[in-house]
A protein has these predicted regions:
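Canonical Radical SAM [4Fe-4S] cluster-binding loop centered on the CxxxCxxC motif
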Residues: 1
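Flexible, charged surface loops at secondary-structure boundaries
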Residues: 5-9, 188-190
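Core AdoMet radical
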Residues: 8-23, 37-52, 63-90, 103-112, ...
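Distinct, well-ordered alpha-helical segments
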Residues: 24-30, 53-61, 90-92, 118-121, ...
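Surface-exposed amphipathic alpha-helices with a cationic face
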Residues: 28-39, 61, 94-99, 185-190
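Conserved C-terminal portion of the radical SAM core fold
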Residues: 89-195
C-alpha cells in the first residue's frame, strides 16, 4: 500500500487475488491499515466466501470494509441438484455477509446454458437483500480448451467489435455469454429486482 504514491488520496481500494481470507488476519490488517491511511476510500474485498465466519465479518466491518463481493460460479455440466446446492450456498453466504457488510454483492461469470439457474439465483439473492450483482462475460483464459469444448462452448467470433490487445488477462469471450447477460438484466428489470 505504501509503495503506491498518493495512495492516501485513493477513492477506492480492492483486496483480491486468489482468496484473501486464506490469511484472514492479514486481510483484516490490510483493510484496517488502508482505512487508516485513506479514510475516505471505499474498501472492497473479493472472496469465494468459503472462509467467512461471523468473527471474520465483524472484524472486517470494524476495520473499515465498505463492500464485500462474493464469487459464484454455476456450471453448465451441473445437475439441477448441484446447481441448487451452489445457489443455496451463495444465498446462505450472502445472508450472513449482509448482517455485517451492507454493501454485499455477487460477481460471477455468465456461463451459457445456466439461464434457469441464474434467474433463480438472481431472485434469491434479491430476496436476502444483495446490494447488486456484477455479471461478467465468460472468457476462455488460453489454457485447457478441452474442458470448454466438453461443455459445448465456442469462442465468440469475432471476439470484440473493436480489436484491441489480445493479451488481455480475461482471455477470449465465450459465445452467447454476453447475450445471456443482457437477457438476465432484462429478466431482473421485468421482475422488479432491487439488485
Amino acid at each position: 500500500f505504501d509503495s503506491i504514491g498518493g495512495a492516501e488520496n485513493a477513492t477506492h481500494i480492492g483486496l483480491t487475488g486468489g482468496e484473501p481470507l486464506l490469511h484472514a488476519q492479514r486481510a483484516v490488517e490490510f483493510v484496517s491499515y488502508a482505512h487508516h491511511r485513506a479514510p475516505q476510500a471505499h474498501i472492497r474485498l473479493y472472496t469465494a466466501g468459503d472462509f467467512l465466519t461471523e468473527d471474520i465479518l465483524e472484524r472486517l466491518r470494524d476495520a473499515g470494509l465498505s463492500e464485500l463481493r462474493l464469487s459464484v460460479k454455476l456450471d453448465v455440466a451441473d445437475t439441477p441438484e448441484e446447481s441448487r446446492a451452489t445457489i443455496d450456498d451463495a444465498v446462505r453466504k450472502m445472508a450472513l455477509v449482509k448482517r455485517f457488510i451492507p454493501h454485499a454483492m455477487v460477481e460471477m461469470p455468465v456461463i451459457p446454458g445456466t439461464k434457469a439457474a441464474m434467474e433463480l439465483l438472481l431472485c434469491e439473492l434479491d430476496a436476502v437483500g444483495a446490494w447488486g450483482i456484477n455479471l461478467l462475460e465468460f472468457g476462455y483464459p488460453f489454457n485447457d480448451w478441452g474442458e470448454f469444448s466438453r461443455r459445448g462452448f465456442k469462442a465468440k467470433n469475432p471476439p470484440y467489435p473493436v480489436v484491441y490487445n489480445w493479451d488481455y488477462a480475461g482471455g477470449l469471450p465465450i459465445d452467447e455469454s454476453e447475450a445471456l447477460a443482457l437477457e438476465l438484466v432484462q429478466f431482473a428489470m421485468r421482475k422488479g429486482l432491487g439488485l
